[in-house]
Design a protein with these regions (language model features):
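Ferredoxin-reductase
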Residues: 2-81, 86
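FNR/FR-type flavoprotein reductase catalytic core
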Residues: 69-211
Length: 211
């Protein structure tokens, strides 16, 4: 697997970090993913790109899993270290990003916001809203990067616990909205059903499951 140099390893919360590396010369489309690992470990994991697809580097939003085979090793790398990066792969991409008539709703949980951060950075002129389900305030990763009003988070821990399904049940979604879902499987199943019941056609729904 090709190796690239680590440029930065930025801690975002207690368990989540942003890994910045050199990028391959391949054409990359926002929403695609890469297999990433530590050389010599024999294991890697698929991560969605977090950065602008046109940037001179790659960024990955990674949650460190206790006892995991890949994320703890990546959490320990430092600038100058090599990491294995293979890709890009995947088709979880915007089909017509130049169509200014479209409204997008990006719904995600945890680090599932990664492809949507990439969409927003790569296509700054699209009209979008992000609905981000997190546990705590410190998991609102780089929320200040989005235009005012474009980012909404719901916290499952705290004084008034809420999840994205609760939010959607109390807010109307225009059936013409193009909706992308990224996160855990149960969230995607539940949200898909809510949106279909609200009249959003299946052709307007795109999903990516984060394991």
């Amino acid at each position: 697997m090709p190796t690239f140099k680590v440029l930065e390893n930025r801690q975002l919360s207690e368990h989540t970090f942003c890994l910045k590396t050199e990028r391959p010369s391949d054409t990359i489309v926002a929403g695609q993913c890469f297999n990433v690992g530590v050389p010599g470990s024999g294991v890697n994991r698929e991560y969605s790109m977090y950065s602008d697809a046109n940037a001179p580097h790659l960024e990955f939003l990674i949650r460190q899993v206790e006892g995991g085979t890949v994320s703890p090793a990546l959490a320990a790398v430092e600038p100058g270290d090599p990491v294995e990066v293979d890709g890009p792969y995947g088709e979880f991409t915007l089909k017509t990003p130049d169509d200014s008539s479209l409204n997008y709703l990006f719904i995600c949980t945890g680090t599932g916001i990664a492809p949507f951060h990439s969409f927003a950075a790569t296509y700054p002129d699209i009209r979008y809203q992000i609905l981000h389900g997190v546990r705590r305030d410190d998991e609102q990763y780089d929320a200040a990067h989005y235009p005012a009003g474009a980012y909404t988070s719901v916290l499952s821990q705290g004084a008034k616990p809420q999840c994205v399904t609760d939010y959607l049940k109390s807010h109307t979604v225009d059936p013409d909205t193009i909706v992308y879902l990224c996160g855990n499987r149960s969230m995607i199943i539940d949200v898909f059903a809510i949106l279909r019941d609200a009249g959003v056609p299946g052709d307007n729904l795109f999903t990516e499951v984060f394991l």
